[in-house]
Amino acid sequence: MNSWRDNVRKVEPYTPGEQPKEEGVIKLNTNENPYPPSDKIKQAMSGIKNLRKYPDPAATKLVEAIASYHGFDKEEVFVGVGSDDVLAVAFMTFFNGKKAIFFPDITYSFYPVWAELFGIPYEKKAVNDAFEIQKEDYYVENGGVVFPNPNAPTGAFLSLEVVEDIIQHNQDVVVIVDEAYIDFGGDTAKELTRKYDNVLVVQTYSKSRSLAGLRIGYAIGNKELIKAMNDVKYSYNSYTMNEPSIVLGTAVLEDEEYFQETRNKIIDTREWFQIEMRKIGFSFADSKANFIFATHESVSAKEIFEAAKKAKIYVRYFDQPRINNYLRITIGTRDEMETLLDFLKEFTATK
């Protein structure tokens, strides 16, 4: 009996970063923005009405606002419940062949989860010792390509020349450039979507826009790609975007000054923090994201991770090959990073 268990889908799920509930925590483990959203959010809240009704299935106002902000037509923008939702829809829509899709071995750990969930064959391509993608690995025949730029969890950034080279060698499949962290120092590949009809660029409100709690992500691509994604989305959930996300996601794009101010604060803090971390024995590649991926010359990452957690400082540790002696540290406020730095100086000095 109990034969229903034989029909349960067996998957190894994605493991999200810890969300501590206790007070007084310095939370530097999930790459959230340390600054509050723009005041435009508060002003726009009064415009959230008719919650008893379903939201606009097309999220037209939000799509139009994103399209206008980036200089594209609304038919070239797809929105979803965070970039995870956008990426999942893209996987379902474009990766349906028998050939393996390619992505880096050290990368966003949701990629293999989606591939397994949707029955997509895949191959991981090893990054080099500096955690850089080797473009030549993507020259061979495949069923699609996806990679973050900057990469997560390493922060390594590919130049647009390298990104375009990968695209040029893969014009028969869809190439997804996952730009969750692009606003912290890199050059976006969005303009390449005008040149190549197989390129999809994915971005999010969760990092640079301080709106991780609203879950807003989007993709930019040619109209045919976007229509295909909407067709898939409407086949399982036509109301993915809720009304608050549509209203507030539209409003936040109106405050460019605040966006640039907080973005630059994070970049400045990151550059200062990298200098200070090297002074106390940490090494890492220069990051173009809102985090660094660091290892210490003599103290193990796991030991630092556990001690920091006891001190109510949360960073991210990945217990997996090649990166199990590294910590991913989100860039918080200057005060938060000074507190972490003081802890690290004291802790590593005793080892």
Residue ranges: model-predicted function:
Residues 267, 279-311:
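Conserved PLP-binding catalytic core of the aspartate aminotransferase-like
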Residues 59-100, 298:
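Phosphate-binding glycine-rich loop
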Residues 198-278, 282-285:
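PLP-dependent aminotransferase class I/II
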